[in-house]
Amino acid sequence: MLEGCILAGSRQIESTTNNSVPGAPNRISFAKLREPLEVPGLLDVQTESFEWLIGAEDWFQRAVDRGDVDPKGGLQEVLEELSPIEDFSGSMSLSFSDPRFDEVKAPVDECKDKDMTYAAPLFVTAEFINNNTGEIKSQTVFMGDFPMMTEKGTFIINGTERVVVSQLVRSPGVYFDESIDKSTEKTLHSVKVIPGRGAWLEFDVDKRDTVGVRIDRKRRQPVTVLLKALGWTNEQIVERFGFSEIMMSTLEKDNTAGTDEALLDIYRKLRPGEPPTKESAQTLLENLFFKEKRYDLARVGRYKVNKKLGLNVGQPITSSTLTEEDVVATIEYLVRLHQGDQTMTAPGGSEVPVEVDDIDHFGNRRLRTVGELIQNQIRVGLSRMERVVRERMTTQDVEAITPQTLINIRPVVAAIKEFFGTSQLSQFMDQNNPLSGLTHKRRLSALGPGGLSRERAGLEVRDVHSSHYGRMCPIETPEGPNIGLIGSLSVYARVNPFGFIETPYRKVVDGVVSDQIDYLTADEEDRHVVAQANSPLDGDGRFEEERVLVRRKGGEVEFVSASEVDYMDVSPRQMVSVATAMIPFLEHDDANRALMGANMQRQAVPLVRSEAPLVGTGMELRAAIDAGDVVVTDKAGVVEEVSADYITVMADDGTRHTYRMRKFARSNHGTCANQRPIVDAGQRVETGQVLADGPCTENGEMALGKNLLVAIMPWEGHNYEDAIILSNRLVEEDVLTSIHIEEHEIDARDTKLGAEEITRDIPNVSDEVLADLDERGIIRIGAEVRDGDILVGKVTPKGETELTPEERLLRAIFGEKAREVRDTSLKVPHGESGKVIGIRVFSREDDDELPAGVNELVRVYVAQKRKISDGDKLAGRHGNKGVIGKILPVEDMPFLPDGTPVDIILNTHGVPRRMNIGQILETHLGWVAKAGWNIRLASDGADGSTEVPAWAAKLPEHMLSAPADSIVATPVFDGAQEGELQGLLGATLPNRDGETMVNSDGKAVLFDGRSGEPFPYPVTVGYMYILKLHHLVDDKIHARSTGPYSMITQQPLGGKAQFGGQRFGEMECWAMQAYGAAYTLQELLTIKSDDTVGRVKVYEAIVKGENIPEPGIPESFKVLLKELQSLCLNVEVLSSDGAAIEMRDGDDEDLERAAANLGINLSRNESASVEDLA
């Protein structure tokens, strides 16, 4: 499989980043190193794989230019594999070729709006050949609608945006393993030949020193039986393996004489109970390993086998089945490995090293990207179709057959649909913010069909491996059961034609580092000596030091002379993923906390006003642009018109381009996706320039949170255990306010009793409730709604009612039916509120496509403005997370000497044991960036000299001063040094009163807002970037008075989604018993839970102001009796005088009478949907 060539373009990093994107903000960078390679397209892993699948022109051109890759698309490959389909006699055949696509049926936005799939019709040329007459019939055949990838690397399936995650699997090939026998403590060796498709072949040396073989995981046999079955004589075996004692002893123990006996022996093991014949045994063995239909090593497997065993190296790959030479070379390799040889002479004469394989090495694990996953699914669909075609060939008249009559496309369409709809690797896209979407597309999963399972995966496969360097991020992985099984592609990594991940290195020749970029797989890297990116170089690219720190195979680190170095890293951030590369001062954070920081950035919600970080890493711009949520110019020109909804650009070639904005759209996760222009009419724009910001972006840079003035100190114990204290200013000024949009949907269907109707005419509802509904019964845009309010009025027929004889006579004469309807309106779910911002109505009358039986569909969008509140979760980028414990009035917050109150107070205890010191350094640099600096001014001597201090000697001229509110970048592993930080803190600009607030140690004297007294010790103060996470208290807080009950036990349901109650469990009952609170306990176990009669009577007593009646028998007790009776145990309940009490299954009459009198229904059972509960 091909991932296109990424050309290495050289670029000099000056001390500002973002130079490669026109109009980008000028971020002052502390980077010391030059990066010779631009960050590649971050979505290439998705887009290029899909281009390979459909054989897109761009991909085809790249493949032809590259030369070492078969320029054949994935669909073409599958069709060639399938063709020709022949009937059982071989007299007819059907071939497929030339897959091509028509235009997509509808644009992306329309597909999302109307719940359609973004797809294009696929056509192939089908050729039917009658081999008897030589007649050829050719037709263009429609093969179904094929889901297409959007520009952002996603798929729209039934209106929802989905991502296909790349899968990490063990590569087909030959794997040698070593183990210790527990009884004899001997070293045993084994080898597995793993195909892409087909039976496994395993060889091993056991503790008795015999070489055995297992075919298709069946019983073990001497390996010489297999060799004889392949036609080898004893003499040939001795000639090839005479050097090995264990092979000779195996041959002696083998009782089979000749090929025929060996074949029959194998057949008996594989097909026990079936009568063996020489022909059937020969056919079985050939089918198992030597027929392409049954056995497929895949191109990658053939490549790996050739490389391992030294066969046909450098020759083009033609066959993908096993050969006799493969089997023999594998056995020889195993034997030599067991006897301790270091090398083996391959049949071609080359020497290959003899060693065991590490299955967790990235040379043995490959990536199945989108294109290959879909290709495999199409292969499954086509093989099902093949059976149908064969059957139809035999049943239809030869003269009347055309390709169209033979082909049934249903299996193919169903296979594609099944993959996108239900596969573990086709996932609902994470759209919390642009970074979460980008990371989702770059995710690598070891789970899924053909992969590992959570339960089976051990520690080794989850662990960080030296071969991950530059390929998979060692930091970013989920916490919990999936840790280590799901990873993220490193920034510079790409995927090669065989699916192995490659990473770029700079070529070093005789100690001189060149700008030539070579992409190496993990196998190739093991053969070289690699220096790190920050090894000091002189002006000619030579290493400054004689001894250079390098790494060798297995991640071993040592010092070697400069002439021994083969390659050098291209960038210090080469090993990490995009999210991890956005953590400033990552090098000062513990890995566990950095993991949390990388993961929590993906949970940040877009705020009403986005703000880019004062302290960034230089990765923000590329991440935001490649995520695809900003609007970028296609052609350079001049902005002609700007409005909130669109931007028109007159291009230099005279064409006019209109770019539309997404306005307050709902993302998959209910966050608000809104785009707003950042250019003005008349402004000149270049190709690739950002025209409009999206959610979580500012001036085209990723902006996930806010820069807040932070004080790191304890405050009256209110920020104990990671609690956070906030200033009320953040609430009043909507600094941390986010907009959340919920979609509510209702449809009007045909029922057995008649059609449902969307109407304003709802029975038993007052006019006040209907005030905001229009004449159709749909709420107006702009209406404020609370839980329980009607959004769309709907009535459902209830069926005929009992009529008096007189009414029946009238109905018979006039033909009218007494229709009764019940209210099934769409209401705002419990605990939600907001403002109606959009309504979409789809109707069969307007020729909209609707599911069968649905006449009308209404969608209502309700937006909620959520201010920050107690209980919301905030986090920094270093894994420093906490819940808001208290929001203080501004006047009570600690303040700086000039009267500036801080925004947020974090506890000091959250830093030392978590070892994420990056947050402290970020706070210091944040203050420096906000205040601005002038190094010359600070070092001004008494004699008026303005010499630059030693710590600033390496800084370029324009970094010696910066105005207030500057933005800076400190790239990972190449950022601001501690000495620079300390110097800059001493060189910050004074405020308008001429005072510097923060000392050179980063601390300031703070004053208590309540008393005005200074705190006894100076406090660390600065600006930290704080994210508001999606764990909002409004989504979690919940209370219930009456609600639904479980059908069997009649106890209240649990959880907010079910509008459930709080469980009073076994241990809580013990606590009540311990305190002797008998009546409280009785209440909890009966009338507050499952005493069906008692709870209605209690409600009645409360309404009428009477005393609470005695509790009855709880339903769960009756369930217990039934369960005991079902075990044939006769259980009776006796009264105090010993008489048996009759247990009724439910005092239904009392219950119904009481409920009817009160006009309530307390005994709501489990309901089908949450809407019914409100």
Swiss-Prot record:
Disulfide bond annotation, renumbered to this chain: none
Nucleotidyltransferase found in the keyword field: yes
SUPFAM superfamilies: beta and beta-prime subunits of DNA dependent RNA-polymerase
GO-annotated biological processes: DNA-templated transcription
Annotated GO MF terms: DNA binding; DNA-directed RNA polymerase activity; ribonucleoside binding
InterPro entries: DNA-dir_RNA_pol_bsu_ext_1_sf (IPR042107), DNA-dir_RNA_pol_bsu_external_1 (IPR019462), DNA-dir_RNA_pol_su2 (IPR015712), DNA-dir_RNAP_su2_dom (IPR007120), DNA-dir_RNAP_su2_hyb_sf (IPR037033), RNA_pol_bsu_bac (IPR010243), RNA_pol_bsu_CS (IPR007121), RNA_pol_bsu_protrusion (IPR007644)
Record PANTHER family: DNA-DIRECTED RNA POLYMERASE I SUBUNIT 2
Quaternary structure (record): The RNAP catalytic core consists of 2 alpha, 1 beta, 1 beta' and 1 omega subunit. When a sigma factor is associated with the core the holoenzyme is formed, which can initiate transcription.
Protein name: DNA-directed RNA polymerase subunit beta
